[in-house]
UniProtKB/Swiss-Prot annotation:
Protein role: Catalyzes the dephosphorylation of 2-phosphoglycolate.
Name of the protein in question: Phosphoglycolate phosphatase
Record's GO cellular component terms: cytosol
Reactions mediated catalytically: 2-phosphoglycolate + H2O = glycolate + phosphate
Amino acid sequence: MKIKAISIDIDGTITYPNRMIHEKALEAIRKAESLGIPVMLVTGNTVQFAEAASILIGTSGPVVAEDGGAISYRKKRIFLANMDEEWILWNEIRKRFPNARTSHTMPDRRAGLVIMRETIDVETVRKIIHELGLNLVAVDSGFAIHVKKPWINKGAGIEKACELLGIKPREVAHIGDGENDLDAFKVVGYRIAIAQAPDVLKENADYVTEKEYGEGGAEAIFHVLRVSGYMDF
């Protein structure tokens, strides 16, 4: 099937380990865009961050933010959830673990809770969710713990973004490096894991890059362009 769009994670996928954008990934993204392939940034970060990144990087596709809970395209934002139970959870976590802290981006978030992973581990968060009987899931992105409704994930966000583009999710190639990219892998037509990704992501990928971080992201994009016939091998 012809790939009509590329969705790609930001942190660890088009960046250096220190989260600075990698110039080779920028080059690859702009090559895809020049060939008429819209690139969609998909991130656990806020929609405001994703919108700004899209402008600076030069992507034309929708942005999928907050792990799939927020989509922005052509100055229109769509939110797929609210945060009622997330705040119940956070209040309980703070009682038990006073040193736990959320991301500094929380005031801008509308679809999920982000807890800094160095202050509490994901299994503890999952245990508290279970004890409270909350309809929430906790996922470790490698940078933070994302807590959200079960139906909020990168796959759901990509499906909504595809509606806006007028294409099918199976016409998208997704590139990522974290556990939270698994749901994206379930809906797209082609799946690429970056070299430093966890084994569970690599096991579900069609292709695993040789390079890590932003160099791997660039390798992945050029691989998609070649296997889809947009570039020669």
